[in-house]
């Protein structure tokens, strides 16, 4: 009896994190499908919610939507902010994305902030 109770508790403790992440992963996939089908009004709230929970892919997608103006006016400052938040994760894709975004948004009239300036 004690052994079966321990097994049940162990199973619940080990699978709970997987189950909670499963919902967020599905939300991310749903948001990406909305974005792919240009349903930005449905995609953005899902992506923003995940981005605020430190999902790197969602942070990069939010930055991309701000940079491209998908669903609203372009906002380079917000795009750089979210790219910097993604870069803080240490993910090399996020670093590469942030650098490309900074190069893409740089012009005579706009110089993107460094990440150290963004979080002051």
Residue ranges of predicted features:
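Bacterial N-terminal signal peptides that target proteins for export
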Residues: 1-8
